[in-house]
Amino acid sequence: MSNFAAQRLNMIDAQVRINDVTDPRIHAAMGAVERERFVPPAKRALAYADVPVEVAPGHYLLDPRTFAKMLAMAEVKVTDRVLDVACATGYSSAVLGRLAQSVIALEQDAELVRAACEILPAAGAANVVVTQGELVSGFKAGAPYDLIFVNGSIDIVPDALLAQLNEGGRLVAVLSSGQAEVFVREQGRIGSRAGFDARIPALVGFTKTVGFVF
């Protein structure tokens, strides 16, 4: 067993299961995706550390604990069509791709888009499509989505993203107040429920001027 493979198993035991993420599908998906592929060579020693990993200036992979707990909140179904917002190098998209039917990986930074387009096929993520665009606008051409997954802390949830949810669709995000929440479209209205406490790096552009404060 390689050192990274051992670290991956330890991640599941020491960062995922121990934090009340009990879904075996999440364990299997995170255990199958080689997180080190998505981290710059100089930072691969941090690939499985319980901290966000900066993959480009101001762009991060979420720490495994927070990421796993967000996946659990999302209740990803095998039939889900997913929009993965701020996918960075594509790690979150690769994991989501093992849980859902299809994933659109949205990233604003051109260099990260190029990196994700190279890494994801090599990681076997055949049901993930990478696209470049403004994060707060989502990707209307692929809507509606059953799940929108936001990889970063935000002040607000933009109306443009909520409008792209299918009936019964969920949006999972960590608010800058330090609370993870799920927003659900039901009968044309948006409701929300609080999850767990979390502090993760902020996403640029998600300010109070582009949507409602919840």
Give the location of each predicted region.
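Class I SAM-dependent transferase core
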Residues: 1-83, 91-94, 99, 112-126, ...
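Conserved nucleotide-cofactor-binding alpha/beta core module
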Residues: 75-190
